UniProtKB/Swiss-Prot annotation:
It is a single-pass type II membrane protein. Its cofactor is heme. Keywords: Endoplasmic reticulum, Heme, Iron, Membrane, Metal-binding, Monooxygenase, Oxidoreductase, Signal-anchor, Transmembrane, Transmembrane helix. Its main location: endoplasmic reticulum. The keyword Membrane applies. Signal peptide: none annotated. Heme binds at residue 436. It holds the Pfam family p450. The keyword Metal-binding applies. It is found in: Endoplasmic reticulum membrane. This is Cytochrome P450 71D95. InterPro entries: CYP450_71D (IPR052306), Cyt_P450 (IPR001128), Cyt_P450_CS (IPR017972), Cyt_P450_E_grp-I (IPR002401), Cyt_P450_sf (IPR036396).
Length: 496
């Protein structure tokens, strides 16, 4: 009996491997003028070259050898990595409609309600409508300013905590995450929900499994792998918990009047738009829940990640820290509150934030997918191909940046570059149709808290640590978060 079972398993595996090899051979016969890439292994393609490395690092190494448009075969998935300003501009501007899709993964499909959101939604009427609502109604510059009292209130809470912990080691990773989460909770829901900490953890776990590197994502034709995907059951458990939390939030908003607790929050706006007769594509409850999860995913993870990288780089570069603090303390002296308009004059601090995002982009590999066959840099890119723009690699390319491995904010004084999507070697928020619609909101949630952290406190590393001892490693996942928590010692600054 055991022999029969073993034989059946061997036959099943052999059949699976043979079918994949035949499929890859047939595909290779029809491929012409495709981007260059490293030699492939049967079945796995180039997956072995990513082993033990972060994908953006491994793909940067490939680009050095094979060029800025590199073919990377991820199992069955034909992928192209773009690592130059010119190729990125071609894909994200000149060919933007053709390259405007997102590739789907098991993680995004389960956690983001069949990709019924904005971040992972395919390019469609639904996506265009939700993005328009987001830009004009939810996260416009006017609305970002209207959330100023929330930022100030939550920042005051953090400052009080740091003041009471002066001279002690503080886990800034935890504190900044709490701050950002609280701001987003109040902007989205009108109040801090009871389950906000659990929701943040669910977001982190979801993003770590949303990068498209699950085996079932890399071999999509295999029903067996899809069935046996060991993370699938975990994802569904997480989805059920997320749905319980979001359903409660939605139900509570249905019962209350819009603005009952002081102003229209993001969910109030979505409910209002849901009833608008001008809406062409119906806004479902699942679409609202997916958008809420988007807000947490993009808002908490990227804003807190950038703030922590800024603080880490300032601790590694004391001269930059001193210059930034001098500017902030001169400009904000005597002010009782700080918000978006106040930080506009902090030119050097803004350069510090830019330099941080150059070296540590919130999304190191921006994912796209082809909606039709197209040509980039003279190479054929097949329909449905996965495209990854290596933002991390371009931010450290000596062709575009002098001393790219040096943290040097002054470089932005010499060359005018911004992250609004027109300088394609520097696109931490993306570019083209899919540029981040929450750019202004996210930036405000970095710059306003940062200015106050630099104004009110002097900072030291935990006892016994030197700047050269700091671990600046990145963690795995869709976002470029720090691998280890940032531990700092605040000392209250007293203005002379």
């Amino acid at each position: 009996m055991e022999l029969q079972i073993s034989s059946a398993i061997i036959i099943l595996v052999a059949t699976f491997v043979a079918s994949l090899l035949i499929k890859q051979w047939r595909k290779s016969e029809s491929r012409q003028n495709l981007p260059p890439g490293p030699p492939k292994l049967p079945l796995v393609g180039h997956l072995h070259l990513l082993w033990g490395k972060l994908p953006q690092h491994a793909m940067a190494d490939m680009a050095k050898k094979y060029g800025p448009v590199t073919h990377v075969q991820l199992g069955e998935v034909f992928s192209v990595v773009l690592s130059s300003r010119e190729a990125t501009k071609e894909a994200m501007k000149l060919l933007d409609p053709a390259c405007a899709d997102r590739f789907e993964s098991i993680g995004t499909r389960i956690m983001w309600y069949d990709n019924d959101d904005i971040i992972f939604s395919p390019y469609s009427d639904h996506w265009r409508q939700m993005r328009k609502i987001c830009v004009s109604e939810l996260l416009s510059a006017r609305n970002v300013r209207s959330f100023g009292f929330i930022r100030q209130d939550e920042m005051s809470r953090l400052l009080r905590h740091l003041q009471s912990s002066a001279g002690e080691t503080v886990d800034m990773t935890e504190r900044i995450a709490t701050l950002t989460c609280s701001i987003i909770c109040r902007a989205a829901f009108g109040a801090i929900i009871n389950d906000h900490e659990e929701l943040v953890e669910l977001v982190k776990d979801s993003l770590s499994m949303a990068s498209g590197f699950e085996l079932a994502d890399l071999f999509p034709s295999s029903k067996l792998l899809n069935l046996l995907c060991w993370n699938k059951s975990k994802l569904w458990r997480m989805r059920r918990r997320v749905d319980t939390i979001l359903e409660a939030i939605v139900d509570e908003h249905k019962l209350k009047k819009s603005g009952e607790f002081g102003g229209e929050d993001i969910i109030d706006v979505l409910f209002r738009m849901q009833k608008d007769s001008q809406i062409k594509v119906p806004i479902t409850t699942n679409a609202i829940k997916a958008f809420i999860f988007d807000t947490f995913s993009a808002g908490t993870e990227t804003s807190s990640t950038t703030t922590l990288w800024v603080m880490a780089e300032l601790m590694r570069n004391p001269a930059v820290m001193a210059k930034a603090q001098a500017e902030v303390r001169a400009a904000l002296k005597g002010k009782t509150s700080v918000d978006v308009d106040d930080v506009q004059e902090l030119k050097y601090m803004k350069s510090v934030v830019k330099e941080t995002m150059r070296m540590h982009p919130p999304i190191p590999l921006i994912p796209r997918s082809c909606r039709e066959e197209c040509e980039v840099n003279g190479y054929k890119i097949p329909n449905k191909a996965r495209i990854m723009i290596n933002v991390w690699s371009m931010g450290r390319n000596p062709l575009y940046w002098e001393k790219p491995e040096t943290f040097w904010p002054e470089r932005f004084d010499q060359v005018s570059r911004d992250f609004m999507g027109s300088d394609f070697e520097f696109i931490p928020f993306g570019a083209g149709r899919r540029i981040c619609p929450g750019l202004n909101f996210g930036l405000a949630n970095v710059e306003v808290p940062l200015a106050q952290l630099l104004y009110h406190f002097d900072w030291k590393l935990a006892e016994g640590m030197k700047p050269s001892d700091m671990d600046m490693s990145e963690a795995e996942g869709l976002t470029g978060i720090r691998k280890n928590n940032l531990l700092l010692v605040p000392t209250l600054y007293k203005s002379p």
